[in-house]
Amino acid sequence: MMSLESLWLWTFAISFIVLIAYLIGTWNHDFFSKRNIPSLKTVPFLGNMGPLVLRKASFAEHSQNIYNRLKGYKYGGMFEFMNPVLVLRDPELIKMVTVKDFEYFLDHRAPISEEAEPMFGKNLFNLRGHRWKEMRSTLSPAFTSSKMKNMFVLVSECGKQLGEFLMECSRDKNKKTEGCKIEREGDLLTVELKDLYTRYTNDVIATSAFGIGCDSLKNPKNEFFQMGKDVTNFGGIRQFIFLGYLFSPRLMKYLNLKFLSSKATEFFRFLVHNTMDTRKTKGIIRPDMIHLLMQAKEGTLKSEENGETNGKIASKPKWDDDDLTAQAVLFFFAGFDTASTLLCFMSHLLATNPDVQNRLQDEIDQSLEENDGKLTYEAIHSMKYLDMVVSESLRLYPPAIFTDRKCVKNYRLPMEPSYTLEPGDAVWIPIYAIHHDPKYYPNPEKFDPERFSDENKDNIKPFTYLPFGSGPRNCIGNRFALMESKIALVHLLCRFNLKVVSKTPIPIKITKKGFNMTVDGGFWLGLEERTNQ
């Protein structure tokens, strides 16, 4: 039996350990209060990340809750675990940080280091300072209007394959769908769109960036598609690994926990290196990303500033093979997931708003009729209502729920309360929450493409619409993502009406199981073949 003295010692020891743990878990949580900055109440160790860790809220809901709790302030403080983060709510302040005073906020935060995860740490999003500027300049020529026009034919062919595949499935009830999530509900073809659209975007990236033909609609077991699903899976254990890097990058590096699977990493290494070697040996020149990376490696790529080639030859960069492969992985990730997610939400919004769908189909029909049934680069960019629908879809469901910046030199905020950010301080811009703020968008949950009409779009306050970020650090591939999304939608809507079915999630609820903008149970819709086509 334990003596009274032993019991007292154990009680003291446990109390002491709890006290030390509490002090460690809250040691910096007075960071904002000491600076007279409004901030949120915190929990030891978790800071303000508890709802995400415990899966009580989706990432979108979590960011919106933080934004709303700081209502009335131009900025305020929160904690990512034990790390202080300044949340910006004021559009003018966002403009200063992302554009006007960009030199003070040059970098993104990069919790996953190059040493811990080369394919993640070395990509354009995570590169810093001069290395980021050099890589951004290198990759920019891949996304000019002329390059988009050259790739349009390749992307449109993938869109055509998508439309024809669905027509075959609709007309042939016995057609094998090779693992596609396709069912029937009465006379309707019911489809899980996330699976369908990721097959499409996979093929788009494969052909336009790597020069590879996959046809994932008929052959979903191809390795390119399987690795794409692996790289873009932010659920399960990978979600907690990422949160672990936010909590303590050093600990995660010590534990050697990888964010990307070794299989996916080696696949992309081999793909990029092998493609480069083959092209170099056989003298193959193709206007795609691989060719640009080859030029960058050899130091023969013309640098580009502000979207125009300046004619100067860039000095040969000191990049290794992993530097180049990391950009290919980023391009694949952005094109694979961003466009497919946008297409899912856009299709859902059209199915649940048939008046908008009908008007968009009228515009598509008229454009195709004027161009002898052909979809051209010029035609798709002349469809104003299509652009309005896409813009409003991106407002409601932006691909990035938030973006961030890291201060690189002292910066005094020009607003009260006065505060000077120091190098290393983190800044958070809650895109999703701003897009859903009734102050900027009346009735923000309503799908209303008219917000972006020629008559109304000037009413949108600058720096409150940020679907692809803002300033020099915005998404480099946004024009490509928009183009591949519009092409798929046109090929679909010229053949089918989108219908709500029993499996369609109404209302949409963003999943709490990961960082991806997706829904539990999938994006199920019905496809009804148009009788007038």
UniProtKB/Swiss-Prot annotation:
Cofactors that this protein relies on: heme
CDD domains: CYP6-like
GO cellular component terms given for this protein: endoplasmic reticulum membrane
Domain of life the protein comes from: Eukaryota
Locations listed in the record: Endoplasmic reticulum membrane; Microsome membrane
UniProt GO molecular function: heme binding; iron ion binding; monooxygenase activity; oxidoreductase activity, acting on paired donors, with incorporation or reduction of molecular oxygen
Induction text: Expressed at all life stages.
Membrane topology: Peripheral membrane protein
Keyword annotations from UniProtKB, A to Z: Endoplasmic reticulum, Heme, Iron, Membrane, Metal-binding, Microsome, Monooxygenase, Oxidoreductase
Chain positions recorded as heme binding sites: C475
EC number(s) recorded for this UniProt protein: 1.14.-.-
Principal subcellular localisation of the protein: endoplasmic reticulum
Record-stated family: Belongs to the cytochrome P450 family.
Protein name in the entry: Cytochrome P450 9e2
Native species: Blattella germanica
Gene name of the record: CYP9E2
